[in-house]
Amino acid sequence: VIRFVTSASPKRVMAIGQKTEIIQYEINTYDSIQCIIEWEMLNGTKFTETILTSWIDPESSSAISDQKIKFIGTSGRYEADQKERGIRINTDNVGVLHINPDFCMPYGYNDGDIQWRGYGIDSITTFLNDVADLEDGLKNISDLQENRPSFKESLISTMVTDAAHKSLKNGSQWEEIKILK
């Protein structure tokens, strides 16, 4: 998401992990990993991202998974909460917005018709519309390459994940990332 929003490139990665719970079950993996990624924007500005990930959650948790993402910048903040199915944006220019708080919701009309809306539905219809436009010759792959997730772009997150894995193996050392053009 960071790459898609900022067009920045990851420069280096460092990860630290803990093995205390799962190892008791003779599974040699991390319970929790903290990862710091240094990014560089096209104008040379650098910033960091912190990722916290864990397999460990209380049995009493209200969801099978609890995923959140926050971008905190100089003039604003973006927060998405998978469990609550909500997105909150707070910027100096606009203030607080609670955008599309649910995955999908039914909207009723005066004629009794119901239409489902929300980012869950919208993402699927966008994909299907793109496929139809490709088939009809209204768009080509290069049109979508810049404004849709792509296999090419997925290589960036794969490189970050690989660098985090190497960092864990190398005593939490910084691992440089070389982006291929």
Language-model regions, residue ranges each:
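Active-site rim elements
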Residues: T20, I56, N110-Q115, D143-F151
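C-terminal hydrophobic helical "lid"/dimerization subdomain
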Residues: S154-K166
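Glycine- and charged-residue-rich phosphate/anionic-cofactor binding loop of Rossmann-like
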Residues: G137-I156, S172, E176
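Short glycine/proline-rich turn/loop motifs
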Residues: C104-D111, E135-Q145
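Contiguous beta-strand/loop segments that form the cofactor/metal-binding neighborhood of enzyme cores
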Residues: V1-N93, D113, D122-K139, D162-H165, ...
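Active-site loop of classical SDR/Rossmann-like NAD(P)-dependent oxidoreductases
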Residues: I114-T125, P149-I156
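C-terminal accessory helical subdomains adjacent to catalytic cores in phosphodiester-
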Residues: N100-F103, P149
